[in-house]
Amino acid sequence: TLEVTLFPYTTLFRSLGEIVDTIYECARAVRAVPDSAEGPSTALEMPQDGLRYRLMSTFLSYLPKEKAIFDLKMNVDPRGSFTELVHTLNCGQVSINISKPGITKGEHWHNSKWEQFIVVSGHGLIQMRKEGTDEVLNYEVSGDKIQSVIMLPGYTHNIINLSETEDLVTVMYCNEVFNPERPDTYFDKVEK
Protein backbone atom coordinates (compact mmCIF):
# COMPACT_ATOMS: atom_id res chain seq x y z
CA THR A 1 0.00 0.00 0.00
CA LEU A 2 1.27 3.44 -0.98
CA GLU A 3 0.34 6.80 0.48
CA VAL A 4 -0.66 9.25 -2.25
CA THR A 5 -0.95 12.91 -1.24
CA LEU A 6 -3.12 15.07 -3.46
CA PHE A 7 -1.79 18.31 -2.03
CA PRO A 8 -3.40 20.19 -0.37
CA TYR A 9 -6.62 18.19 -0.30
CA THR A 10 -6.37 14.62 0.83
CA THR A 11 -4.08 11.72 1.47
CA LEU A 12 -5.21 8.41 0.02
CA PHE A 13 -3.84 4.97 0.65
CA ARG A 14 -3.80 2.97 -2.57
CA SER A 15 -2.26 -0.25 -3.72
CA LEU A 16 0.29 -0.02 -6.51
CA GLY A 17 -2.14 -2.03 -8.67
CA GLU A 18 -4.90 0.58 -8.19
CA ILE A 19 -2.51 3.39 -9.10
CA VAL A 20 -1.29 1.58 -12.24
CA ASP A 21 -4.88 0.78 -13.27
CA THR A 22 -5.85 4.44 -12.87
CA ILE A 23 -2.86 5.57 -14.95
CA TYR A 24 -3.76 3.13 -17.75
CA GLU A 25 -7.42 4.21 -17.65
CA CYS A 26 -6.45 7.87 -18.07
CA ALA A 27 -3.97 7.02 -20.83
CA ARG A 28 -6.65 5.06 -22.72
CA ALA A 29 -9.05 8.00 -22.42
CA VAL A 30 -6.48 10.43 -23.84
CA ARG A 31 -5.67 8.05 -26.72
CA ALA A 32 -9.43 7.79 -27.40
CA VAL A 33 -9.69 11.49 -28.32
CA PRO A 34 -10.93 11.23 -31.91
CA ASP A 35 -8.72 12.22 -34.86
CA SER A 36 -11.75 13.01 -37.02
CA ALA A 37 -15.54 12.92 -37.03
CA GLU A 38 -15.78 9.60 -35.20
CA GLY A 39 -18.31 10.84 -32.70
CA PRO A 40 -18.28 12.34 -29.24
CA SER A 41 -15.55 11.97 -26.66
CA THR A 42 -16.23 9.92 -23.55
CA ALA A 43 -15.89 11.60 -20.17
CA LEU A 44 -14.50 9.47 -17.35
CA GLU A 45 -16.09 9.43 -13.92
CA MET A 46 -13.78 11.62 -11.84
CA PRO A 47 -14.36 12.71 -8.25
CA GLN A 48 -12.75 16.15 -8.05
CA ASP A 49 -10.58 15.25 -5.10
CA GLY A 50 -9.40 11.97 -6.56
CA LEU A 51 -6.25 10.65 -8.17
CA ARG A 52 -7.99 10.04 -11.53
CA TYR A 53 -8.99 13.73 -11.69
CA ARG A 54 -5.40 14.91 -11.21
CA LEU A 55 -3.92 12.28 -13.52
CA MET A 56 -6.34 13.15 -16.32
CA SER A 57 -5.39 16.82 -16.06
CA THR A 58 -1.72 15.85 -16.23
CA PHE A 59 -2.26 13.57 -19.25
CA LEU A 60 -4.26 16.29 -21.05
CA SER A 61 -1.48 18.82 -20.45
CA TYR A 62 0.67 16.58 -22.70
CA LEU A 63 -2.00 16.12 -25.38
CA PRO A 64 -0.53 16.89 -28.82
CA LYS A 65 -1.70 20.34 -29.98
CA GLU A 66 -3.30 18.89 -33.10
CA LYS A 67 -5.54 16.68 -30.91
CA ALA A 68 -6.91 19.66 -28.95
CA ILE A 69 -9.48 20.16 -31.73
CA PHE A 70 -11.50 17.45 -33.41
CA ASP A 71 -14.59 17.23 -35.57
CA LEU A 72 -17.85 15.81 -34.32
CA LYS A 73 -20.22 13.79 -36.47
CA MET A 74 -23.14 16.04 -37.42
CA ASN A 75 -26.25 14.14 -38.45
CA VAL A 76 -27.69 16.61 -40.97
CA ASP A 77 -31.00 16.51 -42.83
CA PRO A 78 -33.34 19.18 -44.29
CA ARG A 79 -34.80 19.78 -40.79
CA GLY A 80 -31.42 20.79 -39.30
CA SER A 81 -28.83 18.72 -37.45
CA PHE A 82 -28.23 16.58 -34.37
CA THR A 83 -24.73 16.16 -32.92
CA GLU A 84 -23.66 14.10 -29.92
CA LEU A 85 -21.13 16.16 -27.94
CA VAL A 86 -20.08 14.05 -24.94
CA HIS A 87 -20.82 10.53 -23.71
CA THR A 88 -20.30 9.57 -20.09
CA LEU A 89 -19.64 6.06 -18.82
CA ASN A 90 -22.75 5.90 -16.64
CA CYS A 91 -24.57 9.25 -16.75
CA GLY A 92 -25.77 9.53 -20.35
CA GLN A 93 -24.87 12.00 -23.06
CA VAL A 94 -25.03 15.65 -24.04
CA SER A 95 -26.03 16.64 -27.57
CA ILE A 96 -26.88 19.73 -29.57
CA ASN A 97 -29.91 19.92 -31.82
CA ILE A 98 -30.38 22.60 -34.48
CA SER A 99 -33.86 22.98 -35.98
CA LYS A 100 -34.55 25.03 -39.11
CA PRO A 101 -37.33 27.67 -39.04
CA GLY A 102 -40.83 26.21 -38.73
CA ILE A 103 -39.59 22.65 -38.15
CA THR A 104 -41.00 20.19 -35.59
CA LYS A 105 -38.70 17.46 -34.25
CA GLY A 106 -39.39 14.61 -31.86
CA GLU A 107 -42.91 13.18 -31.81
CA HIS A 108 -41.81 10.20 -29.73
CA TRP A 109 -41.74 8.93 -26.15
CA HIS A 110 -39.55 6.75 -23.94
CA ASN A 111 -40.28 4.14 -21.25
CA SER A 112 -37.31 4.79 -18.97
CA LYS A 113 -35.12 7.28 -20.81
CA TRP A 114 -35.52 10.93 -19.84
CA GLU A 115 -34.09 14.06 -21.39
CA GLN A 116 -33.63 17.74 -20.58
CA PHE A 117 -33.99 20.33 -23.36
CA ILE A 118 -32.29 23.70 -22.94
CA VAL A 119 -32.87 26.23 -25.74
CA VAL A 120 -29.81 28.48 -26.02
CA SER A 121 -30.72 30.37 -29.20
CA GLY A 122 -33.97 31.03 -31.00
CA HIS A 123 -37.62 30.77 -30.02
CA GLY A 124 -39.48 27.50 -29.71
CA LEU A 125 -42.31 25.50 -28.23
CA ILE A 126 -41.82 22.23 -26.37
CA GLN A 127 -44.92 20.07 -26.15
CA MET A 128 -45.58 16.94 -24.09
CA ARG A 129 -48.55 14.62 -23.70
CA LYS A 130 -48.76 11.67 -21.34
CA GLU A 131 -49.44 8.49 -23.30
CA GLY A 132 -53.11 7.51 -23.07
CA THR A 133 -54.29 11.08 -22.32
CA ASP A 134 -55.31 14.10 -24.40
CA GLU A 135 -53.90 16.96 -22.30
CA VAL A 136 -50.98 18.69 -24.05
CA LEU A 137 -48.43 20.58 -21.95
CA ASN A 138 -46.94 23.60 -23.76
CA TYR A 139 -43.67 25.26 -22.75
CA GLU A 140 -42.63 28.32 -24.75
CA VAL A 141 -38.84 28.62 -24.60
CA SER A 142 -36.25 31.07 -25.84
CA GLY A 143 -32.52 31.64 -25.84
CA ASP A 144 -33.30 35.00 -24.20
CA LYS A 145 -34.24 33.16 -20.98
CA ILE A 146 -32.32 29.92 -20.45
CA GLN A 147 -34.63 27.27 -18.95
CA SER A 148 -34.50 23.50 -18.70
CA VAL A 149 -37.53 21.39 -19.62
CA ILE A 150 -37.52 17.71 -18.59
CA MET A 151 -39.00 15.25 -21.09
CA LEU A 152 -40.79 12.91 -18.72
CA PRO A 153 -40.77 9.13 -19.32
CA GLY A 154 -44.10 8.01 -20.74
CA TYR A 155 -44.79 11.43 -22.31
CA THR A 156 -44.61 11.84 -26.07
CA HIS A 157 -42.80 15.09 -26.82
CA ASN A 158 -41.66 17.42 -29.57
CA ILE A 159 -39.88 20.71 -30.07
CA ILE A 160 -41.10 23.26 -32.61
CA ASN A 161 -39.06 26.15 -34.00
CA LEU A 162 -41.50 29.08 -33.90
CA SER A 163 -39.24 31.41 -35.87
CA GLU A 164 -39.64 32.03 -39.59
CA THR A 165 -36.02 33.16 -39.99
CA GLU A 166 -33.76 31.84 -37.18
CA ASP A 167 -32.49 28.39 -36.32
CA LEU A 168 -33.50 26.97 -32.93
CA VAL A 169 -30.44 25.70 -31.02
CA THR A 170 -31.11 23.29 -28.16
CA VAL A 171 -28.65 21.59 -25.80
CA MET A 172 -30.03 18.17 -24.89
CA TYR A 173 -29.04 15.96 -21.98
CA CYS A 174 -30.19 12.33 -21.94
CA ASN A 175 -29.73 10.07 -18.92
CA GLU A 176 -28.36 7.25 -21.10
CA VAL A 177 -26.17 6.98 -24.18
CA PHE A 178 -28.21 6.04 -27.25
CA ASN A 179 -28.12 2.29 -27.89
CA PRO A 180 -29.44 1.33 -31.36
CA GLU A 181 -30.12 -2.22 -30.12
CA ARG A 182 -32.39 -0.87 -27.35
CA PRO A 183 -33.47 2.60 -28.48
CA ASP A 184 -36.42 2.96 -26.04
CA THR A 185 -37.97 5.41 -28.54
CA TYR A 186 -41.57 5.04 -29.74
CA PHE A 187 -43.23 7.25 -32.37
CA ASP A 188 -46.45 9.03 -31.39
CA LYS A 189 -47.53 12.55 -32.32
CA VAL A 190 -48.15 14.92 -29.42
CA GLU A 191 -51.20 16.48 -31.05
CA LYS A 192 -53.60 13.93 -32.53
Predicted segments, located by residue:
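Short acidic-glycine-tyrosine-enriched beta hairpin
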Residues: 130-155
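A short glycine-rich, His/Asp/Glu-containing loop-to-beta-strand
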Residues: 68, 72-107
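Terminal hydrophobic/aromatic helix or amphipathic segment near a protein terminus
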Residues: 26-65
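Double-stranded beta-helix
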Residues: 133-135, 162-192
